């Protein structure tokens, strides 16, 4: 896995739920989750397993991908991960 790249990731918790997040060091972040020092949501649902990761050139795009994913229902989330879809930010064109 790539280090120090901005990424959006999804882990599956022990109860079967998904947790999506952003990091720039995926291995360290998964370790933090599994040590109980990660997000409050995952602390009560250990262990977590990495299910999906997307690398982005910048933090903004990775966080937009995370936000987009969180708006989907479970079926759509599973389809997104299975297809290996990649979030592509749409840029607004200036009319000036």
From Swiss-Prot:
Residues covered by the GIY-YIG domain: 4-79
Highest taxon, organism lineage: Bacteria
Signal sequence coordinates: none
Family, as annotated: Belongs to the UPF0213 family.
Gene3D superfamilies: GIY-YIG endonuclease
Lineage of the organism: Bacteria, Bacillati, Bacillota, Bacilli, Bacillales
Pfam families in the record: GIY-YIG (PF01541)
Name the UniProt record assigns to this protein: UPF0213 protein BA_0032/GBAA_0032/BAS0034
Source organism (scientific name): Bacillus anthracis
InterPro entries from the UniProt entry: GIY-YIG_endonuc, GIY-YIG_endonuc_sf, UPF0213_domain
């Amino acid at each position: 896995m790539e280090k120090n790249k901005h990424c959006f990731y999804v882990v599956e918790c022990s109860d079967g739920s998904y947790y999506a997040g952003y990091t720039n060091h995926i291995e360290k972040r998964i370790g933090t989750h599994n040590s109980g020092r990660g997000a409050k949501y995952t602390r009560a649902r250990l262990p977590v397993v990495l299910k999906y990761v997307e690398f982005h050139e910048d933090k903004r795009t990775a966080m937009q991908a995370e936000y987009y994913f969180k708006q989907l229902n479970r079926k759509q989330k599973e389809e997104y991960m299975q297809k290996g879809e990649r979030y592509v930010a749409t840029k607004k064109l200036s009319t000036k």
